[in-house]
Amino acid sequence: MKDSYISIVIAYLMVTFILVSSMPIEGEKGELGPHRLPCPPGYENYCFNGKCVHVVAQDEPGKPCYSCICDEFYIGERCGTLDLTNPGYFLKG
């Protein structure tokens, strides 16, 4: 009985993880969201392979916080690293 309960819990957690990990992050594919604004002019090239956003919630006094939403297959603070661990990169034709 205990083993079947553990198996059910593990299966539930696995399904939940798969469902949650497949959901797009808010702002990743659609709207920027209420706490993200487009970066000001002059920051067009801030992100090497992605889109610059102003993260208002992370601002410090006198120091705005800029971040990047990386293009597909790129990772890193400014999207400068090609993610070769992503299997989709090799399947893209």
Swiss-Prot record:
Disulfide bond positions: C39-C52, C47-C68, C70-C79
Top-level taxonomic group: Eukaryota
Keywords: Disulfide bond, EGF-like domain, Neurotoxin, Secreted, Signal, Toxin
A GO CC term assigned to this protein in UniProt: extracellular region
Chief localization: secreted
GO molecular-function terms, A-Z: toxin activity
The protein's role, per its UniProt record: Ant peptide with probable defensive activity which acts as a potent agonist of the mammalian epidermal growth factor receptor (EGFR). Mimics, both structurally and functionally, vertebrate epidermal growth factor (EGF) peptide hormones. In vivo, intraplantar injection in mice causes long-lasting (several days) hypersensitivity of the injected paw to both mechanical and thermal stimuli. Its long-lasting effect is unusual for venom toxins whose effects are usually immediate.
Listed name of the protein: OMEGA-ectatommitoxin(02)-Rm1c
Source species of the chain: Rhytidoponera metallica (Australian green-headed ant)
